[in-house]
Amino acid sequence: MVANVETMFYVREKPWHGLGVEVQEALNSADALKMAGLDWEVKQRNIQVCGGAKIENYKANVRSTDGRVLGVVSDRYQIVQNKDAFSFTDELIGGDVRYETAGSLQNGKKIWLLAKMPEREVVGDKVEPYLCFSNTHDGSGSIRVCMTPIRVVCNNTLNLALNSAKRQWATKHVGNIDEKMQEARMCLQLADAYMDELAVCADRLANTTITDEQLDKIGRASCRERV
């Protein structure tokens, strides 16, 4: 199994691949950006052939710190910087946001960050959901945000979190990114409200008592529906 991790940080529990910087407490966005090795920007550069002629309609996404080419994209591609991903998550969750993991995959082509959401109690069990933000800088994928119980520590767990999430939002890197991010905030805030309501309903059902006669009626009705 390949982790594809370039840089990352994690809180306490070491990932299976053993890579990354361990911290003892979940970090705020400013510290998480640095500890995850994500404190760099993506710059767009023109592309030229050997003779010096410019290739029209395409740009190269280049990492600011080392000049690494992350990918070739169309000139319609809108960059979402790593720091903007953290700002989005800070604003969405609000309060004292804390990050559990974050990092760079595939030599900077993909990044993720995982923030802890407020703990909930559902029928006596504590549930600790995360908000996962994933972004690609090589033009291969969309901006994706989801709610997940999965602790993301590598490319495989990121794919698992995104592919199994029941509540998520995604958009391509074109058009008005600011408007799309506002749409994401509204969508995910509704999903968060849904989780709160789900916890209330589950507790209500758990505390509802029914008689043997009522249970028998429910069973008979269920059998009739299957016939």
Give short role names for the model-derived ranges.
Residues 1-88, 92:
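Feature for intrinsically disordered/low-complexity regulatory segments and propeptides
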Residues 83, 87-226:
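Intrinsic disorder/low-complexity polar-acidic segments
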